[in-house]
Structure formats: C-alpha cells, structure tokens
Curated annotation (Swiss-Prot):
Function: Endonuclease that specifically degrades the RNA of RNA-DNA hybrids. Participates in DNA replication.
UniProt protein name: Ribonuclease H2 subunit A
Organism of derivation: Neurospora crassa (strain ATCC 24698 / 74-OR23-1A / CBS 708.71 / DSM 1257 / FGSC 987)
Gene Ontology biological-process annotations: DNA replication, removal of RNA primer; mismatch repair
Residues in RNase H type-2 domain copies: 43-270
InterPro entries per the UniProt record, alphabetical: RNase_H2_suA (IPR004649), RNase_HII/HIII (IPR001352), RNase_HII/HIII_dom (IPR024567), RNase_HII_hlx-loop-hlx_cap_dom (IPR023160), RNaseH-like_sf (IPR012337), RNaseH_sf (IPR036397)
GO cellular component: ribonuclease H2 complex
Superkingdom assignment: Eukaryota
PANTHER family: RIBONUCLEASE H2 SUBUNIT A
MF term (GO), any: RNA binding
E.C. numbers: 3.1.26.4
Manner of cofactor binding, per the entry note: Manganese or magnesium. Binds 1 divalent metal ion per monomer in the absence of substrate. May bind a second metal ion after substrate binding.
Residues at which a divalent metal cation binds: D49, E50, D166
Amino acid sequence: MADIQDEAGPFLPPTISPPALLSGVSQTYFSPIPPQLLADNTPCCLGVDEAGRGPVLGPMVYSAFYLPLTLSDPLLKQKHSFDDSKVLTPAVRLSLMKELCTKDTELHDNCGYATSSLSPLSISSGMLKASKAQIYNLNQQAMDATIALIKGIYERGVNVTDIFIDTIGQPAAYQKKLERVFPTAKITVAKKADSLYPVVSAASVVAKVTRDIALEVLWADRTMAWGSGYPSDSKCVSWLKQNMHPVFGWGPECRFSWGTAKDMLETKGGVKVDWPEEEEEETQKLTDFFMAKRDQAEVDVDDLGTWFGAPAGVECF
C-alpha cells in the first residue's frame, strides 16, 4: 500500500468518503468546474482510466479527467510529467493529486475530474445473482461507471469534444458502444491509453491515488498488513486466511465474488448455509384462491343443510 502521509500529515482527497467506504457503499465525486471552462465554452478533452480491477480487496475506482484541449500536452505532459500511474512513484502520484486539489495552482485552475468508486459489496452483489440472467458482470459495471461519469461532466456544462479511454477488452467494440451514447464527441479507445494520452495518464493518477487512500482508510484499525490487495500477493492471501470469519467471511473491504475469497470460504472452514427453495404455497395462483373459496362455500352449504336436518326423500312418504 502507498504511504499517504507526508510532513503535513495524512492527505484525504475529496474523492474519499470514509463513512461510505466503511459501510460498503459505492461513491461518486465530481470536482468543481474551473470557471473559465464554462465562461467561454472551451473545447475540452476528457480521459478515463481505472484502478483496482483485479484485486480481491478494496474498491474499483474509475476516474474521468478533463481540461482544455490545447493544454493537454503542454500542461500535463511537458510541465507536470503525467504518465501511466504504474510508472510514477507513490510520492509523485500523491504530489500531483495534492496540487490538483489545491486552489490557485495551475492544475486546479485549469482541470476538472470525477471518480466513481465501486465498493467490493456493490461489485460482488452484482456478480453473485441467483440466476445467470440477473448477473451484473464486471465489464457491465465498468461500462456503466464510465458512461455515468462522462454524462455527469456533460450535464455540468463542460464542452467535451474529444474522449480518450483506456480499455482491457476489445477497443473497437467498446468504442462503438460509446459512440452510440456520445455521438457528438470524437472518441478514441485504446489499450495502454494511460501511457499514450496525457489526459488519460492524469485520470489514471486520480484513480490510483483514490484507491490507495481508500485501502489505507479501510485498513486503519487493523494490525496485520494485507499488501496490495491482489490475489497474487502472499500478504493479501495470508491476511484473508487469518481474518476470515466462518459465517460472515470478511468486512466491506473484500470482494466475495472473487475466486480467492469463494474458495477460501468453501475449503478453509467456512460454514455452509443452505437456503430453502420457495414453497409452492407462497406462489399460489389467484385462481387457486377462488377455487378454494368456492369449495369452502359448498362445504358451508352442506353443513347448513344438515344443521336443519337431512332432506327427506320420496321413500319417506
């Protein structure tokens, strides 16, 4: 995990809400829009990237970053050396994020951003639906988060003309979907876009810092280190083993839909819970209800007849 503290103490960006994190709620944040972008309807470019798609611990964070089209290279690449967040050190990422959040700095006055932090609970509840038809897989969740961020920025009045997005899947298919949703923008979807386009590099930094600090907030009251949160990290696996509750598993930090977590619950002492199928009586048809009422009415009539005596036949006379 990245060290989020510096000489001034811990830094908590506005993209982080500790109460939401600790309660397992997904959260979305939109930064204030630089006034000049709205004043003259400045053409802007926008980049989207994510952090935390693969880990079993912590949120998956999507970030959208925008600024005037003419400033993308000179401000982001040449002056501040934005790059793929994985290439930059934690200290450099944190410094860039702090400047972005500090008033009267060049980044703050010319750039805007938004984040969508999908909580482990939200991710897992979508992926673990009872039927396949109801499953809300990770790709669908990622696509919806991306679209919601871009729409939100458009709705706030930003004149986005060019959109650049990093993708893991097939760029062409992803791009066609987005072009149908945003037909007026020039859209570029590419693998490794975070190292090709400065505006995507900036989005990757915002997403990465937000996720790193989210992990720190989730870990704050714990003593055993959990590493990066990836299933391939031995510290992460050890933490999961040592902190698994046999009934409830783990807290809001864990994605229960990940194979690492599911296998551990099934093979390392987790208590199996059987959920009974719904009985037919609970889904009784309306016609069955009226049939039952009719049968009961016939019984009531018969009972009334015997109360006054059995009917006399011809043979009685």
